[in-house]
Regions:
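C-terminal catalytic "cap/lid" subdomain
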Residues: 2-62, 66-267
């Protein structure tokens, strides 16, 4: 079992990704795909007159502030355009993919966090009306049912709160939770960079390996969204996942390349 998370940033080759996944699936590889959609969500939000707002926590993590209107735009893009676009690509390759959000069947479940602390102009502010959370429970029964029935699950945020409310969750950490719950042998975090870079954005500064015992040392070099990927990797290896790879989703055969060790390998 492997779990593949593909980001939603510009430059990602979804056609190559889906072609690669289809070949692996047809060869018998059990797999769950988790995806994002940040760039398209930003574009649609701007077009609808509700531009995205990002906040930085006191610990340095950046996330999307998700008020109710933002959540509705988020669902429209992630669950609609992005999810069905990926499912359609896989179906064209003969894979019976099934697109679901974490809200469906409570596949992903966690605690709703109504407020978030944000550093603005050097001061810490508390912003209320946030619809975010962290995945604490994965419905593995439903995922295993789908897999055993021949369906390839294509998952995306939002998740469900314990009260049944939709919450925005970080996709990388959600994928780590899925990989842990399914006891995956590998978690592949694919994005629009070749891996963790020692000197971002210099792609020649790729860090090839990080010991599993010292994953969080990667936070020293992680910039912006990569910080959440490193955090997700740490959670995955702590949960028993065999290895995590930060790989490049812009190249041909990105999944097999990551499985072969191209990128940053955490093991």
């Amino acid at each position: 079992m492997i779990v593949v998370k593909v980001g939603g940033s510009l430059g990602i080759d979804y056609d190559a990704l889906c072609a690669d996944i289809a070949e692996l699936w047809k060869a018998g590889q059990r797999l769950v795909l988790v995806h994002g959609g940040s760039a398209e969500t930003n574009r649609i939000a701007e077009a609808l007159g509700h531009p995205p707002r990002f906040v930085t926590s006191p610990s340095g993590y950046t996330s999307r502030f998700t008020d109710r209107e933002t959540l509705e735009i988020f669902e429209m893009v992630y669950c609609g355009k992005m999810n069905k676009g990926i499912v359609e690509r896989l179906q064209r390759h003969g894979v019976n993919a099934l697109g679901l959000s974490g809200l469906d069947g409570r596949i992903l479940e966690g605690k709703h966090k109504d407020s978030v602390r944000s550093v603005e102009n050097g001061k810490v502010k508390v912003l209320r009306g946030d619809h975010t959370g962290t995945v604490e429970r994965v419905n593995t029964d439903l995922l295993e049912l789908l897999l055993s029935s021949g369906y390839l699950p294509v998952l995306t945020p939002p998740a469900a709160s314990f009260e049944g409310v939709a919450i925005n969750v970080d996709g990388d950490r959600a994928a780590a939770a899925v990989a842990t719950a399914l006891r995956a042998e590998a978690l592949l975090l694919l994005s629009n960079v070749p891996g963790l870079l020692r000197d971002f954005p210099d792609e020649s500064s790729l860090i090839a390996h990080i010991p599993a015992s010292d994953v969080e040392s990667g936070l020293e070099f992680a910039q912006d969204r990569m910080k959440k990927k490193v955090l997700g990797a740490a959670e995955a290896v702590a949960g028993g996942v065999g290895r995590v790879v930060f790989g490049d989703a812009r190249i041909a055969s990105p999944v097999r390349a990551a499985l072969a060790g191209r990128g940053t390998v955490v093991s």
